[in-house]
């Protein structure tokens, strides 16, 4: 606040603009809400499931190309697709509107799996070849755990949710930058952006844990042993090595903490499903 010539207070125009920007951003975000039939959560999402599907289908070819292309190993590709479809067709995921397809990427070094909006799911050869209990034979329960986790991201609409959250963060960051603009302090914008980044990181960690929980549910519903998802966490831990990024600064929770949450989810869903 600043005093005007008459001794009263006036609000700087930049603050007024910032307040309007912030109010508009918040109204837009909270005005778009729907209940997720699988998770039961109220989500603030502007995209429709049809838009998510279209976005995923459009992005899939480019994503595969950036990751070294699709694998030429037809046998392993077939297994990935079969296990993925078994998880979907025998779980609550079947009752969602998404078009699920499972792809094996040729990258032998990167240990990763991810989902695009609408049901396009990828796993690298680098991760697939590590999903073994004896160093040689593929453990399909582990594969089901990885794919079930990614199906969880799709079902929970995490990509669409993330986009809405990023729009919210960007809108509020713009408002804060406008309100705190000071030509003599060029760091003000950097501070505002840092806050937005921290918000995004927090959401990502929560979404990963929710996908672990859903992955356990889908494994049980489709006849796989969810205890093997704990084994996947051990593989990820070993692959990361001793110099892992501290959990708070990582988008993904630490594998050790994920193992604890998965074990709790196993007991939760075995009770709910009567397994």
Where in this protein do the model-derived segments appear?
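A Zn2+-metalloprotease active-site environment signal
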Residues: 1-275
């Amino acid at each position: 606040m600043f005093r005007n010539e008459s001794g009263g207070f006036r609000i700087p125009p930049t603050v007024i603009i910032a307040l309007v920007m912030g109010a508009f951003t918040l109204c837009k975000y909270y005005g778009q809400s729907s209940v997720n039939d699988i998770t039961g959560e109220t989500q603030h999402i502007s995209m429709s499931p049809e838009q998510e599907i279209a976005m995923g289908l459009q992005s899939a070819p480019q994503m595969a190309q950036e990751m070294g292309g699709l694998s030429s190993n037809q046998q392993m590709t077939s297994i990935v697709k079969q296990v993925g479809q078994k998880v979907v067709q025998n779980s609550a995921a079947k009752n969602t509107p998404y078009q699920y397809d499972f792809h094996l990427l040729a990258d032998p070094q990167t240990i990763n799996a991810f989902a695009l909006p609408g049901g396009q799911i990828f796993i690298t050869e680098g991760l697939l070849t590590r999903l073994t209990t004896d160093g040689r034979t593929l453990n399909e329960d582990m594969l089901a755990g990885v794919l079930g986790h990614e199906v969880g991201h799709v079902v929970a609409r995490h990509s669409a949710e993330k986009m809405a959250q990023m729009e919210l963060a960007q809108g509020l960051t713009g408002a804060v930058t406008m309100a705190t603009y000071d030509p003599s302090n060029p760091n003000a914008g950097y501070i505002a952006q840092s806050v937005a980044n921290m918000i995004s990181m927090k959401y990502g960690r929560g979404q990963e844990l929710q996908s672990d929980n859903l992955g356990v549910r889908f494994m049980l519903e489709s006849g796989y042993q969810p205890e093997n998802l704990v084994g996947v966490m051990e593989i990820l831990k070993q692959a990361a090595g001793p110099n892992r990024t501290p959990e708070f600064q990582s988008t993904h929770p630490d594998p050790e903490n994920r193992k604890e949450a998965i074990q709790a989810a196993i007991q939760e869903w075995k009770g709910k499903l009567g397994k």
